[in-house]
């Protein structure tokens, strides 16, 4: 987004992640404002046009408060994307057993299945936070090409696009 001319602010609750992101931005000559915080703790008078919550909501303690906080940071008619894991047996097998224990792509304990969220639950909570669903797609990872693509299958990963009203 920065390369396309957008004014970008990136936040993360982890100082380590912010440090890595800053190094990446510097290496790629990107002007990104990074802040070590979370939506729940962020005090900003500035409202954002777009919020990307990519693979984060399945790690937060209070989904209601998280989405309320994100909504409060989003401009009216702003867009928020949420990419996350569905709460299914298949997602447990692939995202936890497969990715953490078998493939070792992620440290064991990265995910807690109890925090995974079904699309309909995400949509219901978001509606209460003035966020209306615009689009919902599944996402699939292709091991051979090492790439993600959109899919009608939402049983493991999915991405939702919301608009603030």
Per-segment meaning from a language model:
Residues 146-165:
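Core SAM-dependent methyltransferase catalytic element
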Residues 19, 143-148:
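A short, acidic/glycine-rich surface segment
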């Amino acid at each position: 987004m920065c390369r396309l001319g957008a004014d970008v602010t990136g936040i993360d609750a982890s100082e380590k992640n912010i440090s890595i992101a800053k190094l990446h931005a510097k290496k790629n000559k990107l002007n990104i404002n990074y802040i070590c915080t979370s939506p729940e703790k962020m005090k900003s008078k500035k409202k954002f046009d777009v919020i990307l919550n990519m693979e984060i909501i399945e790690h937060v303690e209070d989904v209601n408060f998280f989405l309320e906080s994100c909504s409060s940071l989003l401009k009216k008619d702003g867009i928020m994307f949420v990419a996350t894991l569905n709460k299914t047996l298949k997602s447990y097998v692939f995202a936890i057993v497969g990715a953490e224990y078998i493939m070792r792509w992620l440290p064991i304990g990265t995910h807690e299945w109890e925090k995974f969220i079904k699309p309909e639950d995400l949509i219901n909570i978001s509606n209460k936070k003035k966020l209306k669903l615009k689009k919902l797609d599944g996402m699939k990872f292709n091991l051979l090409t090492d790439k993600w693509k959109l899919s009608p299958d939402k049983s493991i990963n999915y991405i939702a696009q919301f608009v603030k009203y």
